[in-house]
């Protein structure tokens, strides 16, 4: 059996699942705004780490392709590079205070190692408590019968953390969760 080796910044903090920790940038309650489940109440868990660099979202088609940019040493789009040059990642204390960008990956603080310190590192129990605290009625099925979905997003939510997802989904406080979407 060959085990996939991930860059250290994306690997779980500990491979012993009883003490392993999940790195995530944020969790929040909102209404799903994309895909088949538009309009459904949802809790989003945005994990840290991504093996892609989607620099060209929102840019004109005349912009050089990502591979061309990387060959010439460009690893961030201009907006992210501008933030790094301004050293905002060193002077801002909270993930929530980082500016929204309009080109490239909009979750830059969830993918680039330079922003890793903004992310939480939590046990499965701690993540579950955080998710439950975000539910309007503290449970995955509301009193009116409406299910609240869990949206696993990122970064790339299927990168290294999947070993912890079984423990997360089998947690006793997650037993009423019926719908999970992975945004990759």
Give the positions of each predicted feature:
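Conserved Radical SAM active-site core
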Residues: 2-18, 22-25, 52, 56-184
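S-adenosyl-L-methionine
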Residues: 26, 32-38, 42
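Conserved N-terminal beta1-alpha1 strand-loop-helix module at the mouth
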Residues: 38-43, 47-52, 128
């Amino acid at each position: 059996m060959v085990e996939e080796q991930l860059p250290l910044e994306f690997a779980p903090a500990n491979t012993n699942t009883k003490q392993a920790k999940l790195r995530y940038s944020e969790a929040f309650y909102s209404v799903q705004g994309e895909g088949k489940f538009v309009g459904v109440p949802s809790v989003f868990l945005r994990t840290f780490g991504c093996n892609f660099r989607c620099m060209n979202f929102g840019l004109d088609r005349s912009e050089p392709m990502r591979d061309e940019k990387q060959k010439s040493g460009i690893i961030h789009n201009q907006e992210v590079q501008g933030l790094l040059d301004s050293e905002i990642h060193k002077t801002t204390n909270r993930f929530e205070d980082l500016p929204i960008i309009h080109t490239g990956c909009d979750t830059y603080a969830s993918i680039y190692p330079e922003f890793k310190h903004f992310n939480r590192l939590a046990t499965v129990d701690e993540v579950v408590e955080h998710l439950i605290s975000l539910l309007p009625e503290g449970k995955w099925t509301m009193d009116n019968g409406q299910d609240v979905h869990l949206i696993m997003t990122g970064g790339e939510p299927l990168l290294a953390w999947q070993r912890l997802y079984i423990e997360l989904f089998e947690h006793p406080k997650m037993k009423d969760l019926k719908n999970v979407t992975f945004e990759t």
